[in-house]
């Protein structure tokens, strides 16, 4: 056994009523002029969350949107500078926290993240920005939030359809972490626990969307899964999803949900150790099929065509995904990759 374990993580405050810690976290970080970021849809929630610290808010910006368009990032950074903000409070999911990361990258302001989905961006130093139909990603320690407040009550109003796909998106982070070249024994344990907790939570949320315990378990699983991704390299699954999202503007979590079973099936024979862990975590002898059925049986999409992709886009997406080399356990083959995309486009069960 050989590994180098260099764990990177923000400070985490977790549990019901943990939002009460927001004033203390701002004080700890010396933030007294915060820029509050949300999407347009979550602007009212953002103001509600920020109300107890309104005296320490310099400005609100509610323009966050999927895949962090460059123009949106420029606007948010301009507001951060003109308002003389000395910190960022990001209230929302991957779109909002992703925008906060670009603001932090360009201004070096500290982030306090308050997630309202299970996307997990808050636990990584990964950032992305989209310009000219291309989503560029990278890693930088400056974009890692300084504190993350996981308040399960904030997810109770998250629509069920988004809850399921967001949770499967979280699972995708841990799945790829299991076969990353820089995986470690501790990250493997975290991935197994995170996947198992999230799968249990999905079934319970689907039956009872306002089950606070299930919502808490989903956040717990998302925290673990994202923590894994924050400490490993990304492979085929994430590359495909970033390409589909940045090029075709497909919805982030739904795209992860559709692609994950197929990307795992593509790599399955090359990662026997990861497959053993997944069989335990998923309680199923065939992990790709288990993930496909998890989505299908809980009302989530299983076909890229249902997300707005056109069949004629398949070859273009495949070629883009092959342009940049990245670590993947199985060699990338154009014909096999296009077959994967066709299966995902039509919503067929995954095949190796």
UniProtKB/Swiss-Prot annotation:
Species whose genome carries this gene: Pseudomonas knackmussii (strain DSM 6978 / CCUG 54928 / LMG 23759 / B13)
PANTHER family, A to Z: ALCOHOL DEHYDROGENASE, ALCOHOL DEHYDROGENASE 4
Record's keyword annotation contains Secreted: no
Keywords attached to this entry: Aromatic hydrocarbons catabolism, NAD, Oxidoreductase, Plasmid
Pathway noted in the entry: Aromatic compound metabolism; 3-chlorocatechol degradation
Catalytic activity: 3-oxoadipate + NAD(+) = maleylacetate + NADH + H(+); 3-oxoadipate + NADP(+) = maleylacetate + NADPH + H(+)
Gene Ontology MF terms: alcohol dehydrogenase (NAD+) activity; maleylacetate reductase activity; metal ion binding
Family per record: Belongs to the iron-containing alcohol dehydrogenase family.
Gene: clcE
Protein name: Maleylacetate reductase
The enzyme's E.C. designation: 1.3.1.32
Pfam families: ADH_Fe_C, Fe-ADH
GO biological process, one term: catabolic process
Entry superkingdom: Bacteria
EC primary class: oxidoreductase
């Amino acid at each position: 056994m050989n590994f180098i374990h260099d764990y990177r993580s923000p400070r985490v405050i977790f549990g019901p009523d943990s939002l009460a810690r927001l004033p203390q976290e701002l004080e700890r970080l010396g933030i007294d002029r915060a820029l509050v970021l949300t999407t347009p849809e979550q602007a009212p929630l953002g103001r509600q969350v920020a109300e107890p610290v309104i005296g320490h808010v310099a400005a609100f910006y509610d323009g966050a949107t999927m895949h962090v368009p460059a123009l949106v990032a420029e606007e948010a950074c301009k507001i951060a500078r003109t308002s003389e903000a000395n910190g960022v409070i990001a209230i929302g999911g991957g779109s909002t926290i992703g925008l906060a990361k670009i603001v932090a990258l360009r201004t070096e302001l500290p982030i306090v993240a308050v997630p309202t989905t299970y996307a997990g961006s808050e636990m990584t130093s990964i950032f992305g920005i989209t310009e000219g139909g291309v989503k560029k990603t990278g890693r930088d320690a400056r974009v890692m939030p300084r504190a993350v407040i996981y308040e399960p009550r904030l997810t109770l109003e998250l629509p069920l359809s988004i809850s399921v796909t967001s949770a499967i998106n979280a699972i995708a982070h841990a799945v790829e972490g299991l076969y990353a070249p820089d995986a470690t024994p501790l990250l493997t344990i975290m991935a197994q626990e995170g996947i198992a907790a999230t799968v249990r939570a999905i079934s319970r949320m689907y039956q009872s969307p306002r089950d606070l315990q299930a919502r808490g378990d989903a956040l717990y699983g998302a925290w673990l899964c994202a923590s894994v991704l924050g400490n490993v390299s990304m492979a085929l699954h994430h590359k495909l999803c970033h390409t589909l999202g940045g090029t075709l503007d497909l919805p982030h979590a739904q795209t992860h949900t559709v692609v994950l079973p197929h990307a795992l099936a593509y790599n399955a024979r090359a990662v026997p150790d990861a497959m053993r862990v997944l069989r335990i975590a998923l309680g199923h002898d065939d992990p790709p099929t288990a993930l496909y059925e998890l989505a299908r049986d809980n009302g989530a999409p299983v076909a890229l065509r249902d997300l707005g992709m056109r069949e004629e886009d398949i070859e273009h997406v495949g070629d883009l995904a092959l342009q940049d080399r990245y670590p993947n356990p199985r060699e990338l083959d154009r014909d096999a990759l296009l077959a994967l995309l066709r299966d995902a486009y039509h919503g067929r069960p995954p095949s190796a």
